[in-house]
């Protein structure tokens, strides 16, 4: 694979991301696919999965995350994304190992997301103590995370 293909793939990825941010998800997906054909990266597979999820194609999103992990197992985002998609599907217990893998991934930003998602699992299970622990951990990592702050406030209000 030459540097030309890599550069072309990177350009397609950037265009895909711009399309996605503009809400043109089908166009974004097409560009991610083209980028992957030229030079597959964990990022491109993960972002294609993200586009599929917004289009309601959650199973395809999960499949892309598995492909991302195969390309680069150190990239943490697809682990968290699989966990989030499983939560979305109501498969909370299946989400936990994926979220824990995201927490320990070598290359992952933003680090607070798997903690926030694990808190969602604990809230679903009505395990208030573990939910509080994960929400507090989320806020240690990302003090400005409003969803965690709001959820922690709601949780603590239940016991006051």
Task: List each model region and its residues.
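Structural signature of alpha-solenoid helical repeat scaffolds
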Residues: 3-4, 36-37, 70, 106, ...
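Alpha-helical segment of the N-proximal tetratricopeptide repeat
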Residues: 5-41, 47, 54
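Structural signature of tandem alpha-helical TPR/SEL1-like repeats
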Residues: 21-33, 54-67, 89-104, 113, ...
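Short coil turns that delineate tetratricopeptide repeat
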Residues: 39-40, 73, 107-109, 143
């Amino acid at each position: 694979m030459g540097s030309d293909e890599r550069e072309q793939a990177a350009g397609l990825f950037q265009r895909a991301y711009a399309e996605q941010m503009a809400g043109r998800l089908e166009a974004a997906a097409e560009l991610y696919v083209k980028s992957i054909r030229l030079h597959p990266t964990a990022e491109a597979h993960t972002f294609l999965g993200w586009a599929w999820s917004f289009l309601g194609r959650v199973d395809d999103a999960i499949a892309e995350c598995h492909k991302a992990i195969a390309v680069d197992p150190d990239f943490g985002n697809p682990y968290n994304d699989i966990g989030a998609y499983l939560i979305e599907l109501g498969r909370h217990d299946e989400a936990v190992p994926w979220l824990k893998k995201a927490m320990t991934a070598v290359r992952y930003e933003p680090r607070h997301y798997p903690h926030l998602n694990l808190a969602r699992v604990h809230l679903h299970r009505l395990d208030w103590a573990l939910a509080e622990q994960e929400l507090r951990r989320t806020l240690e990592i990302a003090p400005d995370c409003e969803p965690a702050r709001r959820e922690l406030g709601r949780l603590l209000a239940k016991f006051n």
